[in-house]
Design a protein with these regions (language model features):
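Secretory targeting signatures
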Residues: 1-24, 301-337
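A generic signature of intrinsically disordered, low-complexity regions enriched in glycine/proline
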Residues: 6-8, 237, 295
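N-terminal soluble domains immediately following signal/targeting peptides that reside
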Residues: 23-290
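C-terminal low-complexity, Ser/Thr- and acidic/Pro-rich disordered "stalk" regions positioned immediately N-terminal
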Residues: 275-312
Length: 337
């Protein structure tokens, strides 16, 4: 066989293998009103009103690159309510639009289930998904918060016999740049020296744009920015800074010691935009603001001097005119802003 042909074939196989490892698979749990809007998930979707019906969609794929795969089995879905009661939900098989690994569009097998938020506090949606192709079993948790200052239940242990991420940081009200800390456990015990993967979800168009930019800038290893990694300490503790707003996935894995299944605990963290919004004034804008402030001060001084010279009958009239002058200067400044 021609040597060049062998070399080309080997390179092609290597490329295919590398493509298959481009990103981490995650069980994604997104609250939504319909299949048409499921990919437009936001942190606010994880907030509920008392009596509201929440529908959660369960998908399988690479969140960062917005790559989807068919779910090979029906997930087990339950809701652990603030008082500890557990409601098992019936998953309904559906299809959702998405993107294949090669970038072509397609429809993918997914599931959905609904429940009524009937208690104030934090309800935890727990999804068990077994994917034989990837040799993975996920226990994925998403917190649905309800009620003014009823911050109870978000750190509950609900998968005690499996791998689970227990948050130390409350997973709502978090803004970009906050540090998320947690504890990884396996069968109720700390999971030391475990790999924790952290990955942010992107919509389809944004995912394409960011992946293309990453492949150009970090051609030597693009996936290193898709899936970040940290390690737990001897107590199973870990932390990571979630530096952008959006939906984040935090995943701790218990690797099998006997060639069996890898069991993972996945925790979903919705992250808000910075509040209040960060100022982004340039040096030129700051200098302009300083100049305007100086000008306004000079105008206020002139107005005060004019008011004082006009007050002939009584000092009280002078004080009134000074106040009017200062008020006028304030109005001028506010209008300029």
């Amino acid at each position: 066989m021609n040597k060049n042909l062998i070399t080309t074939a080997f390179a092609a196989l290597l490329l295919i293998a590398c493509t298959g490892m481009a990103g981490a698979h995650f069980t994604m749990v997104f609250p939504s009103d319909s299949e048409d809007t499921v990919w437009d998930v936001s942190p606010e979707d994880y907030i509920a009103s008392l009596g509201e019906t929440k529908t959660v969609y369960v998908m399988w794929g690479h969140p960062y690159e917005h790559i989807s795969f068919d779910m090979s089995s029906a997930p087990e879905i339950s809701v652990v309510k603030p008082d500890g009661t557990v409601e098992k939900l019936t998953p309904e098989k559906i299809t959702v639009p998405g993107q294949h690994e090669d970038g072509t569009p397609g429809d993918f097998v997914a599931y959905r289930a609904s429940f009524t938020v009937d208690q104030d506090g934090d309800s935890i949606v727990l999804v068990k998904y077994d994917d034989a192709d990837e040799n993975l079993i996920d226990y994925c948790k998403a917190v649905i918060h309800c009620g003014l200052e009823v911050w109870e239940g978000w750190d509950s242990e609900v998968a005690k016999e499996q791998t689970e991420v227990i948050p130390y940081t409350r997973p709502y009200g978090m803004e970009e740049g906050f540090v998320f800390s947690g504890n990884a456990k396996y069968k109720g015990q700390p999971l030391p020296d475990a790999t924790v993967e952290v990955e942010k979800y992107h919509t389809l168009e944004l995912g394409k744009e960011i992946v293309e930019a990453a492949e150009e800038k970090f051609s030597y290893d693009p996936p290193m920015v898709f899936t970040r990694q940290v390690k737990t300490n001897q107590n199973g503790d870990f932390s990571y800074t979630l530096d952008e707003p959006g939906i984040w996935f935090v995943c701790a894995a218990k690797e099998s010691d006997t060639g069996g299944r890898t069991i993972r605990g996945v925790f979903i963290v919705p992250v808000l935009d910075s509040f209040p919004a960060k100022g982004s004034a340039s040096s030129a804008e700051l200098q302009k603001a300083i100049d305007e402030a100086k000008s306004a001060a000079q105008e206020a001084k002139a107005a005060a001097e004019h008011a004082a010279s006009s007050a002939t009958a009584s000092p009280a009239f002078g004080a009134i005119f000074v106040a009017i002058g200062l008020f006028a200067a304030l109005v001028i400044t506010m209008r300029r802003k």
